[in-house]
Amino acid sequence: MSSKAFRTQIENRNYLSSIGFKFNLAKYPKVDFFSNSAIIPQLTLATAIQPTYLKDIDVPGEKLSFGDFTLKFLVDENMENYMAIYDWLVGLGFPESTQEFKDITTDSADQRDLKEAFCDGTLRILNSNLREIAKVKFQDLFPVSLTSLDFDATNSDIEYFTADVAFKYTVYNIVDTKGDPL
């Protein structure tokens, strides 16, 4: 057998674990510590139709469509991580006044910058030894939904709150630990 054949075979036979991940948002560091579920979004390529005499044929050539990025996180006792997302979402929707939008789109130098409404995020994928092996880098994230917190005094066991947040974004890339494409 040639040495070339050995290079094309799988070297690591361990399987990727669903519990091996960490997520962080550049502007909101309190959210990452409590994350307990994340979904790498669906990626869909629409097709163009090439008409032919017998049958229309699908061919690649349309736009890529990225699904929402959803994250489930444990809500801390002071609700700091929940309120970070809540305030961000309310600021984007400005339900009471346009000042809320101005507050979220003003940078630390008191200059208007619409990029302040967005935030980059990184999902770090870990191996079976909990060492980082890859990153999913999301560009220009912004929240579009945040689940409710349902208080219930009839629960006999202590249940800790989790919240789901859905983000829209521009694009995501999967890179190695150095930032190079896989």
What annotation goes with each model-predicted range?
Residues 1-182:
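Glycine-rich, low-complexity intrinsically disordered segments
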